[in-house]
Structures are given as structure tokens and as C-alpha cells.
UniProtKB/Swiss-Prot annotation:
InterPro entries linked: MFS (IPR011701), MFS_dom (IPR020846), MFS_trans_sf (IPR036259), SLC37A1_2 (IPR044740), Sugar_P_transporter (IPR000849)
Protein name: Glucose-6-phosphate exchanger SLC37A2
TM region positions: 19-39, 88-108, 118-140, 142-164, 179-199, 210-230, 303-323, 334-354, 362-382, 391-411, 434-454, 462-482
Region of interest called Disordered, as start-end residue ranges on this chain: 240-266
Catalytic activity: D-glucose 6-phosphate(in) + phosphate(out) = D-glucose 6-phosphate(out) + phosphate(in)
Domain of life assignment: Eukaryota
Annotated source species: Mus musculus (Mouse)
Tissues where the protein occurs: Highly expressed in bone marrow derived macrophages, and weakly in spleen.
Compositionally biased intervals (Basic and acidic residues): 240-252
Regulation: Inhibited by vanadate but not by chlorogenic acid.
Length: 501
């Protein structure tokens, strides 16, 4: 007697070949960018180890420091009173290089094979991350060494984001893009969490390993990328998606930001892409100015500048804030800071779902930004009153701060990079993504720098700066929110008209 089909085999057959390949690409690019973020996180965990109060620690027998020196166990040159400014300079070296490199990276990403470009970037990123940690074992105490390594790492890390967004955009159409990319974008928070946990293992003993281990993992992932990344569905005989609906159904002006893909009604069917692999002449890569003329690019880019300023200030300074204000150990502060990233995962998925359901990317971002401002104020004043309040407030702040950031860098970037005004030229995706994330990276560089300069005057002032940036991010979306509200009224009017008929 023959048995019935095994449940596992039944499950495998339930999905088409195209679905399996799409799932594989989604998972692979998820792991790729998680590694990028994992390699960025250790510096925020190790900061509290580079400069610490050593007054209660037992001095080694051969110590030559002055008996009144309370920073004898800190790592020179970060053992002086200006350590916050020096740590801010190290952060900013990476972030400024990243911001500058991002504008160039998108141009290269449109013109070079993504597999080579991405895998080379990951291997180099792993190398420079490890070199930072080797400064501990090589007993390097020169500021220029750490700054130079951060600059090089910032430049090579720009290979990541435009490449993975372009690759995912090649495989997935517009249908449920916000939800899919909301889940996928959790790689940012997953990478931050992994980076925090891995760095926390060695931060109190050999902090150099906090960089070397993530660096090695990132380099290995670069080799895996070279072996397995598939740029286009056509490369493995899969069906390419379409990015737009039937033109006859588009009754409104496609140049209107309300009717652009980030705010249009998304169908459940995969839509999409004319890719460069299709038959016929290959479309030219879009110019920088051409990408800026796409409706919505400038507004969302400037909004992301301030949203990313807030997010990256938390990324780089939250563990030190918890260490100084709540008086946890370096490892406990690093572990607790991961809750902000847990909230970021939830926020990214929520923002994607809500924007898909309401067809309103800008309004979703604006509402979350409005709610984030009072939550940051409350976290600063009551978040450290107990472990329970700290956990709850960190998760809520993570949801509201990282939700808009996640939505803009994923679904919005993909929507604008395949805008109707491009007339089927999907080669704009990497450039648009680079412009949006590059502009955001300027804010990412400014945030930690300002935090380093302002924190000596008190942490309250740092939070006032973050709240101000959050409000500015919201204001920059007002025009698009107004357009989306008009679109809702029009849609409701049509719906009422149909019911009367």
C-alpha cells in the first residue's frame, strides 16, 4: 500500500519555482544587509569601555599612572576630558564618508554587476571592521588610525544599501510592497541586535574581538554573496514582475505625487519590472538631476535626513546614555539598547502594513513622527525610573522612530525608483535609493556629532535636539500629506457615487 504524499513535499509543491527563488533572494539580501549593520554597531557598545571611571577598579602591580588618575584603565587617546568629542569624531568619520560615498555609490550600482559590487564591498567592510579591533591587539593609541579606518569603512559600506534595494526591486513588484519590505527591512534592527550581543561578549575583556568577529562574519557573507546572488529573475528563467498597472486605468496625472507609486492603490497581484535584461534596447541609467525631478524624491530625502539623524543618534549614543544615566554595566547597557531595535522591527512592519492598507506613505510617516516627539520626551524623564519603564519606553520609541525611517528607505525608495514618469526605465532604482539614503546619511552624520558636542551640557539638551529634528522631518512631508488627503476625498467621493448608482 502506497503512503500519501509527505507533508514536507506537499509544502514544497505548494509554492511555484518563482516563489522559491524570490524567497531565496529576500532571505539572502536580508542576511547581507544585517551583516552590514552588525559591523557598524560594535563602536557604540565599546564606547563605554574606551573611557570609563576606574576609581573602583584594582590597579595592576606594574601600573605607572598617577594615583589620582581615575581614567587609568581607559584606552588612550579617549582617556582625557574631551573623550566625548573624540568619540564623536570617530563616529563622524564613518558617517560623513558614508554620506558622501552614498551619492556616488548609486551611480556605480547602476553601471556595475551587483554581485561583484556587493560581494567586494562586504569583504572590504569586514576587513576594515576587523582592522579597527586589531588596534587593541596592536596596542595602537593614535586617533588618526581609528579615524582613517572609519573613513575607509564608511566608503565601502555604501555598496550595500543601493545594491540590495535594487536587487529586491528587480524581483518584487508593487503589490504589498510596504508589507514585504517592512518585514525585510527588519534586517537593520536584526543586524544592530546581533552586533550589540556579539560585541557585548568581549567588551569587558578584549574589546578588539567585538570588532574582529563581526568583521569576519561580514567578509564570509561577502563570499556567499558572490557565490549565490541572482540579480535578475530572467537569469534563472523566472518571470519578471511589472511595476505599473495598465496605463488605461491610470486616469490621473502620473506626475502628481499623490498618484505616484508610494501612495497609489496597490493590488494583490505582483506588478512590475521592465528590467535591463528584457528584450529590446537597454535603457540608459538615469542622471542625478533626472532622479531629483521624480515627484516626491526631494521631500522624502529631506525628511529622511532628520529622521535618520534621530535614529543614528540612538544607534551610536543610546548605550552610553543608559550606562551614564541608569548606571548599568557596559554589557547590560548594550543588551538593553537592543530593545530599541526590537521596536524598530515592529515599527517597520507596522508602517508597511498601514501604508499598504491606506495607500499613504507620507501620512503614515507623518503620524508616527508626530507621536515619536512626546515619547522621546517621556523616555528622557521617566524612562530610567525602573527597568520596566525603561524596557517599555525603549520599545515604543523604537517603533515610532524607526518606523518612518524603515518605510522611506525601502518601500518609498522602491516606489519612486520605478515611478511612472520613468516610462519603464527601472535603471533609476539604485540612483534614487542612493539619493534618498545619501541625504539621510547627512543627518546620520550630524546626529552623533551634535550629540557629542551637546552631551557635555546635559542629556536633556540632546533629547531636545532629537525632538526638534523629529518635528522638522514631519513638517517636510506636509505637502505630500495634503495631496494624499485630497486623494482620499476624491476616492471617497467616487465610492459614494458608485453606491448611489
Amino acid at each position: 500500500m502506497r503512503s500519501s504524499l509527505a507533508p514536507g513535499v506537499w509544502f514544497l509543491r505548494a509554492f511555484s519555482r518563482d516563489s522559491w527563488f524570490r524567497g531565496f533572494i529576500l532571505l539572502l539580501t536580508f542576511l547581507i544587509y544585517a551583516c552590514y549593520h552588525m559591523s557598524r554597531k560594535p563602536i557604540s557598545i565599546v564606547k563605554s569601555r574606551l573611557h570609563q571611571n576606574c576609581s573602583e577598579m584594582v590597579r595592576p602591580v606594574n601600573d605607572t599612572h598617577d594615583l589620582n588618575d581615575t581614567t587609568w584603565c581607559s584606552w588612550s587617546p579617549f582617556d582625557k576630558d574631551d573623550y566625548k568629542e573624540l568619540l564623536g569624531a570617530v563616529d563622524n568619520a564613518f558617517l560623513v564618508a558614508y554620506a558622501i560615498g552614498m551619492f556616488i555609490s548609486g551611480i556605480f550600482g547602476e553601471r556595475l554587476p551587483l554581485r561583484y559590487y556587493l560581494s567586494a564591498g562586504m569583504v572590504l567592510s569586514g576587513l576594515f571592521t576587523s582592522l579597527f579591533g586589531l588596534g587593541y591587539f596592536w596596542n595602537i593609541h593614535m586617533l588618526w588610525y581609528f579615524v582613517l579606518i572609519q573613513i575607509c569603512n564608511g566608503l565601502v559600506q555604501t555598496t550595500g544599501w543601493p545594491s540590495v534595494v535594487t536587487c529586491v526591486g528587480n524581483w518584487f513588484g508593487k503589490g504589498k510592497r510596504g508589507f514585504i519590505m517592512g518585514i525585510w527591512n527588519s534586517h537593520t534592527s536584526v543586524g544592530n541586535i546581533l552586533g550589540s550581543l556579539i560585541a557585548g561578549v568581549w567588551v569587558n575583556q578584549h574589546w578588539g574581538l567585538s570588532f574582529i568577529v563581526p568583521g569576519i562574519i561580514t567578509a564570509i557573507m561577502g563570499v556567499i554573496t558572490f557565490l549565490f546572488l541572482i540579480e535578475y529573475p530572467e537569469d534563472v528563467d523566472c518571470t519578471p514582475p511589472r511595476h505599473h498597472d495598465d496605463p488605461e486605468k491610470e486616469q490621473d496625472n502620473p506626475e502628481d505625487p499623490v498618484n505616484s507609486p508610494y501612495s497609489s492603490r496597490e493590488s494583490n497581484v505582483d506588478i512590475a519590472a521592465s528590467s535591463s535584461k528584457e528584450q529590446g534596447p537597454e535603457p540608459e541609467a538615469i542622471s542625478f538631476l533626472g532622479a531629483l525631478r521624480i515627484p516626491g524624491v526631494i521631500e522624502f530625502s529631506l525628511c529622511l535626513l532628520f529622521a535618520k539623524l534621530v535614529s543614528y543618534t540612538f544607534l551610536y549614543w543610546l548605550p552610553l546614555y543608559i550606562f551614564n544615566v541608569a548606571h548599568f554595566s557596559a554589557k547590560e547597557a548594550g543588551d538593553l539598547s537592543t530593545l530599541f531595535d526590537v521596536g524598530g522591527i515592529i515599527g517597520g512592519i507596522m508602517a508597511g502594513l498601514i501604508s499598504d492598507y491606506t495607500n499613504s506613505r507620507a501620512t503614515t510617516c507623518c503620524i508616527m513622527l508626530i507621536l515619536a516627539a512626546p515619547m522621546m520626551f517621556l523616555y528622557n524623564y521617566i524612562g530610567q525610573n525602573g527597568i520596566t519603564s525603561s524596557i517599555v519606553m525603549l520599545i515604543i520609541c523604537g517603533v515610532l522612530v524607526n518606523g518612518p525611517y524603515a518605510l522611506i528607505t525601502t518601500a518609498v525608495s522602491a516606489d519612486l525608483g520605478t515611478h511612472e514618469s520613468l516610462k519603464g526605465n527601472a535603471k533609476a532604482l539604485s540612483t534614487v535609493t542612493a539619493i534618498i539614503d545619501g541625504t539621510g546619511s547627512i543627518g546620520a552624520a550630524l546626529g552623533p556629532l551634535l550629540a557629542g558636542l551637546i552631551s557635555p551640557t546635559g542629556w536633556n539638551n540632546v533629547f531636545y535636539m532629537l525632538i526638534s529634528a523629529d518635528v522638522l522631518a514631519c513638517l517636510l512631508l506636509c505637502r505630500l500629506v495634503y495631496k494624499e488627503i485630497l486623494a482620499w476625498k476624491t476616492a471617497c467621493g467616487r465610492s459614494s457615487g458608485y453606491k448611489q448608482i
